[in-house]
Amino acid sequence: MNISDVAKKTGLTSKAIRFYEEKKLVTPPVRTDNGYRSYTAKHIEELTLLRQARQVGFTLDECRELLALFHNPARHSADVKAATLLKVAEIEQHINDLNQMRMRLLALAEECPGDEGADCPIINSLAGCCHSSSSLPLK
């Protein structure tokens, strides 16, 4: 299979496939006599794993670990589960952080009159100005 066939089968761009090869995340494809890359079903599996792992938030280094587990016939599913649950915990923390940011922004917006005046509690609070009418804590 050539790179455009692999791109179609995996949902990745040719550029992304070459990037993953450059980062040594996939098994290097064999080169044909004319220098073109030749891919196998194993490459499709590796690249599909990479695409889907990236879609759910795994970093490139975490993907490297998942690929090592994928290639290890003696792997333990407990290792894969542990990596997955660790990623879930990171995502939950990120969600909590985003919710706190959202609540702070809503509180700032509530204090702002939103009129034609120049005084803006949002700007004052974000800038840490002491003359802000906002009593919201700075973070």
UniProtKB/Swiss-Prot annotation:
GO BP: positive regulation of DNA-templated transcription
Localization (cell): Cytoplasm
GO CC terms of this entry: cytoplasm
Domain of life the protein comes from: Bacteria
Alphabetized SUPFAM superfamilies for the sequence: Putative DNA-binding domain
DNA-binding region: 4-23
Residues the entry annotates as binding Cu(+): 112, 120
Residue span(s) of domain HTH merR-type: 1-69
Annotated coiled-coil segments of the chain: none
Keywords from the named record: Activator, Copper, Cytoplasm, DNA-binding, Metal-binding, Transcription, Transcription regulation
GO molecular function, one term: DNA binding
Job description of the protein: Regulates the transcription of the copA and cueO genes. It detects cytoplasmic copper stress and activates transcription in response to increasing copper concentrations.
Entry note about domains: It contains a N-terminal DNA binding region and a C-terminal metal binding region.
Subunit structure: Homodimer.
Protein name per Swiss-Prot or TrEMBL: HTH-type transcriptional regulator CueR
Gene transcribed to yield this protein: cueR
